[in-house]
Amino acid sequence: MWEVIIMKTYIGKIHLKWCKNCNVPLLGRVCEVCGSKAEEVKLTPPGDPRLGFQYDMDFINKILEEEFGAKNVLNGKIILLNKIPGNEEAYEIIVDGEVKYLIYFDEDKEKWKVKLKLNGAKDLMEKGAYKKIIKIKNDVVEFLKNRKGSVLRPGIVEFTDDIEEKDDVIIVDENDRVVGVGLAVVSSEDIKNMEKGKVVKVRFFIKDNEDYKPGKIYDNLEEAFDLMVRANEGVIDNYERNAIGFIKNTYEKIKKPVMVAFSGGKDSLVTLILTLKALGKDIDVVFIDTGLEFEETLKNVEDVERHYGIKIIRLRGENFWEKVKEYGIPARDYRWCSEICKLEPLKKFIEENYEDDVLSFVGIRKYESFNRATKKRIHRNTYIKKQINALPIFHWSSLHVWIYLLREKAPYNKLYEKGFDRIGCFMCPAMEMGEMNKIKREFPKLWEKWENVLREYAEKHNLGEGWIKKGLWRWKHKRQ
């Protein structure tokens, strides 16, 4: 069962706001299209939501349909996915300027599940939900209104026969109006045999004088994204101006050859664009091919070269598939792969091509992790002593990055349109189970190659199938 890990502090300022009139996310105080005042959006820390594409919309729609029977719930809306800390992969789904659903990957059931917010349930019923519904007496509604409590068996009029223990359910009154959502503590089969007792632990229930109106619907995402870009134009201009100023000032102070580390990801692409605008093309752009990259990433390197008329230097480390036989399975607490496949080829390149220090502009953002948030904006690489790292987009949120890329019509990696949060090695041990499940589904041959390595290792070291199936290989010290 998914549980949130409470964060005591945010990594930084939460930039996300919303224009309820245009129904688009905002980064400033006012919508630059209609002039409406931006409204706050409550998020779980660290609060760095990413933009949802059509794949994400279809994926979440499918989960909602499987759970509640409602179809195409999110169509015509901009959605954001806020990844939140927990013992399993989980996202808050932001629609119409509020969190309406929380989806999480249930590792025991190996499927995605949903936790409901009240307005999310209202949207589901509007779209024809017919599963996991409990109808209660109107006098019970009046009793539960404006207070927390539970739905008891005597107060239930009827219920659907598909409810399992620990399912989220929609609570409606005798007029089929959504009045609450909560967690079923028993199954439909149990309810049939009960005369009294608790059935639903209520999470949210209607209050007096509540008014709910769904947001504007767009014909397509392209139209919605275009308006979102225009609604944030001035904010993005300001962030671009500050980042370019940082790059120019840093270069003037340090006066060393310039390199941009390009990974095929969105953050490094923004950093490359800004550096080209600030300093021109007389820079080195370096891509490290670990041998574990997706084909889409390798293609993106070519697309970026062609789009900006530059040559990207490709570095290659030692063969991972040979080294894994020597070092064993890489893990979160045993990251030999980063050193051998990434850092060593870069270190060798810098040693051979620069007499002195090199100024490297890197797409690190503080919102990515607490570890990254502690970095100084200009610092020397502790592993590669000649590399001085500078971070132009350190204070940018994920939404700043996406709006900038859309405005620039930049050739971003198409993996993002397949629901990927990050771009990197396809079998990185830092992944969650939901991410691995997606790679297995989208890239079966690639994942099969890795599972064959895991299986061979497991047999050699007397590790059970659960070590692979439950993702225990991701920790070196969980192998026993």
Swiss-Prot record:
InterPro entries: PAPS_reduct_dom, PUA, PUA-like_sf, PUA_sf, Rossmann-like_a/b/a_fold, Sulfate_adenylyltrnsfr_sub2, Uncharacterised_CHP00451
Keyword Oxidoreductase appears in the UniProt entry: yes
Keywords annotated in UniProt: Oxidoreductase
Presence of the UniProt keyword Oxidoreductase in the record: yes
GO terms of molecular function: oxidoreductase activity; RNA binding
Domain called PUA: residue spans: 131-207
PROSITE patterns according to UniProt: PUA
Top-rank taxon, per record: Archaea
Pfam (any one): PUA
Family per similarity comment: In the C-terminal section; belongs to the PAPS reductase family.
Stated name of the protein: Uncharacterized protein MJ0066
Organism: Methanocaldococcus jannaschii (strain ATCC 43067 / DSM 2661 / JAL-1 / JCM 10045 / NBRC 100440)
